[in-house]
Regions:
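Mature extracytoplasmic or organellar-lumen-exposed domains after removal of signal/transit peptides
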Residues: 24-129
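Hydrophobic membrane-insertion alpha-helices, especially the h-region
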Residues: 7-18
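Positively charged n-region of N-terminal signal peptides that target proteins for export
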Residues: 1-4
């Protein structure tokens, strides 16, 4: 009789432990990885916003080229960290670049796209509106 009880205990203990572990890992929220320090990109976009708010859209277009170059160079390091967040920023970047590079850029559209890009740079998990 003791041997049967011992056998049941030796079987039940690992089963309970493994089951508990499986339940815990399946209900624990997935941890997302950030993109690291994006402050240098925010600084450049703040400069672009300042130029655009002063009406210097040509200067803003030149300055956003610095952003584009830095963003493209950092892609291989940043993109693998979090594809979703990177894509959100990249889409907002493309929209801002397009707005500034139109033959006759609209100051209002440029302002809105730059604000959206700055918002996404501050919170990459949220796509631009």
């Amino acid at each position: 009789m003791r041997q049967i009880l011992l056998a049941i205990a030796l079987i039940a203990a690992p089963v309970a432990a493994f089951t508990s572990f499986e339940l815990y890992t399946s209900t624990a929220p997935a941890e997302t990885v950030g993109l690291g320090d994006l402050s240098s990109f925010r600084t450049i976009i703040a400069d672009v916003q300042t130029l655009a708010s002063k009406g210097d859209l040509a200067g803003a277009a030149k300055r956003i080229t610095d952003y584009e170059t830095a963003w493209d160079q950092a892609e291989t390091a940043i993109r693998p960290l979090n594809q979703h967040d990177w894509s959100n920023i990249d889409a907002a970047s493309d929209t801002a670049l397009k707005a500034l590079r139109q033959s006759a850029p609209s100051a209002d559209k440029v302002s809105k796209t730059l604000a959206a890009l700055m918002t996404v740079l501050s919170n990459p998990a949220q796509p631009a509106q």
